[in-house]
Curated annotation (Swiss-Prot):
Tissue and organ expression note: Highly expressed in neuronal cells of fetal brain (in the majority of cells of the cortical plate, intermediate zone and ventricular zone), but not expressed in other fetal tissues. In the adult, highly expressed in the brain frontal lobe, but very low expression in other regions of brain, and not detected in heart, placenta, lung, liver, skeletal muscles, kidney and pancreas.
Residues recorded with modification Phosphothreonine: 14, 289, 326, 336
Protein name: Neuronal migration protein doublecortin
Keyword Ubl conjugation recorded: yes
Effect of residue 59 to L: In LISX1 and SBHX
Effect of residue 89 to G: In SBHX; mild
Recorded name of the encoding gene: DCX
UniProt-listed SMART domains: DCX
Keyword terms of this UniProt record: Cell projection, Chromosomal rearrangement, Cytoplasm, Developmental protein, Differentiation, Disease variant, Epilepsy, Lissencephaly, Microtubule, Neurogenesis, Phosphoprotein, Repeat, Ubl conjugation
Result of altering residue 262 to G: In LISX1 and SBHX; decreased tubulin binding
Source taxonomy: Eukaryota, Metazoa, Chordata, Craniata, Vertebrata
Gene3D superfamilies: Doublecortin domain
Organism name: Homo sapiens
Transmembrane parts of this sequence: none
Length: 365
């Protein structure tokens, strides 16, 4: 006798499907649209995480470097330190990045990048060795259409227009730029450091660029040079102020400048730096010495040629000429000072020198 249990199997399948669908009030995850949407969202997030971001990196303070394009992704760089190490191998040099890449800034220096998630597609960043951003027109030598991002290409039009306007303004203002040597004195307690900076059409492109060069030369303890003042207390606000009547400027950092009279007065060392090389001022003082010796040197020759008024003068001339011809005769009066002849010779030894001094004084007068 055979028993048919097929209807029991179909009933069990139906009950299992109903229990699975009614557990959360939603269809089964295997056959629901919610599961397909979840899978799509997960794949999209994974693709976005693995998608490389195209960014450009510059060297801090290098206005002639066109930058290097990097494809930054989590597959290529496992951590932010790995990105810094790879940038060090690509960008490190002894001038702008002597200690490698340790910091990454935005192109305007307003923000410091701390992770790869903060990097945005199509943007530009500046790599630095120290915690100091140098404000330079980095995008001046770069084609603005390098990025495929539409938003970035639209934003890059503004710096291009600013660069064109700045170049036009520079062409208009080239008349007042002339070769000039200015003295920059560091503000603070004396003795203060002073440097001389040459300004011309090749070194003075903009006011910000001159401030950057002065910062590198003067090396303030507080960092960046923010303000410059003349000795009259007038603040320098534009490039045209460097080419006025003032040649000496006081460099100040972010700290509040103290308007004290002593800050605008120069001491002896600072005045020497203004005048130039200190050895140049000491040169004329040393020149009269050889002239005085040259005036003394022809003295004995002139006295030997001129006739003497007394016999003592003739003896004096005779002894002096013999002493000049034979240097051993100088030791004879000194060896026997007690003899009368030695006293006479010793007396005559100093006579021409005193006469020559009087003659030289008379000639100088």
């Amino acid at each position: 006798m055979e028993l048919d249990f097929g209807h029991f199997d179909e009933r069990d399948k139906t009950s299992r499907n109903m229990r699975g669908s009614r557990m959360n009030g939603l269809p089964s995850p295997t056959h629901s649209a919610h599961c397909s949407f979840y899978r799509t969202r997960t794949l999209q997030a994974l693709s976005n995480e693995k998608k490389a971001k195209k960014v450009r990196f510059y060297r801090n303070g290098d206005r002639y470097f066109k930058g290097i394009v990097y494809a930054v992704s989590s597959d290529r760089f496992r951590s932010f330190d790995a990105l810094l190490a790879d940038l060090t191998r690509s960008l490190s040099d002894n001038i702008n990045l002597p200690q490698g890449v340790r910091y990454i800034y935005t192109i305007d220096g307003s923000r410091k990048i701390g992770s790869m998630d903060e990097l945005e597609e199509g943007e530009s960043y500046v790599c630095s060795s120290d915690n100091f951003f140098k404000k330079v027109e980095y995008t001046k030598n770069v084609n603005p259409n390098w990025s495929v991002n539409v938003k970035t290409s639209a934003n890059m039009k503004a710096p291009q227009s600013l660069a064109s306007s700045n170049s036009a303004q520079a062409r208009e203002n080239k008349d007042f730029v002339r070769p000039k040597l200015v003295t920059i004195i560091r503000s603070g307690v004396k003795p203060r450091k002073a440097v001389r900076v040459l300004l011309n059409k090749k070194t003075a492109h903009s006011f910000e660029q001159v401030l950057t060069d002065i910062t590198e030369a003067i090396k303030l303890e507080t960092g960046v040079v923010k303000k410059l003042y003349t000795l009259d207390g007038k603040q320098v606000t534009c490039l045209h102020d460097f080419f006025g009547d003032d040649d000496v400027f006081i460099a100040c950092g972010p700290e509040k400048f103290r308007y004290a009279q002593d800050d605008f007065s120069l001491d002896e060392n600072e005045c020497r730096v203004m005048k130039g090389n200190p050895s140049a001022t000491a040169g004329p003082k040393a020149s009269p010495t050889p002239q005085k010796t040259s005036a003394k040197s022809p003295g004995p020759m002139r006295r030997s040629k001129s006739p003497a008024d007394s016999g003592n003068d003739q003896d004096a001339n005779g002894t002096s000429s013999s002493q000049l011809s034979t240097p051993k005769s100088k030791q004879s009066p000194i060896s026997t000072p007690t003899s009368p002849g030695s006293l006479r010779k010793h007396k005559d030894l100093y006579l021409p020198l005193s006469l020559d001094d009087s003659d030289s004084l008379g000639d100088s007068m």
